[in-house]
Amino acid sequence: MPKQTLYHYRAGVRIRVGNTDAEGRMVMLDLLAHMKEKALTEINPHLFTIATLTGAAVRAFGPYTGVMDNGPAKKENFALNLQQTGELYGDMFEVSIIRKDEFEYIKDKTGDYGELLQIGKGNSKSRGHQYPAAFLQKVTNWHKYLLLNMCLQ
């Protein structure tokens, strides 16, 4: 994918691709859109995404796995329950929060038909694992369902 190219995805969103090194989240988009379609006929659907996000996760958590949940998942204390279970079994999790500024960061403000940025302008090393989770949630409009993002190293 050439840099700064617009793509139209299954979820019906136009995305400006700015970094082809972040291809994992682009592949996951169509899979999430497909699973959302399937979730419409399921009772209490839960969806997990797992990505390496190595650099950002290591900077944030060191050797531990990070988990982030969206609103419905947070209401069920999903990430917190994972963290507590991990502590019992010696497999530690760090809970991270997807904040509203992550959703602002991914908006395409160029005005030429793009809706979202696959990677924001500039460098977001300080929260490099949260905005991809917000990106996946926004593109797939998954906010109505439980979505848990895990970043492993």
Question: What kind of region is each of these model predictions?
Answer:
Residues M1-Q153:
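A generic structural signal for tightly packed, nonpolar segments enriched in small/aliphatic residues
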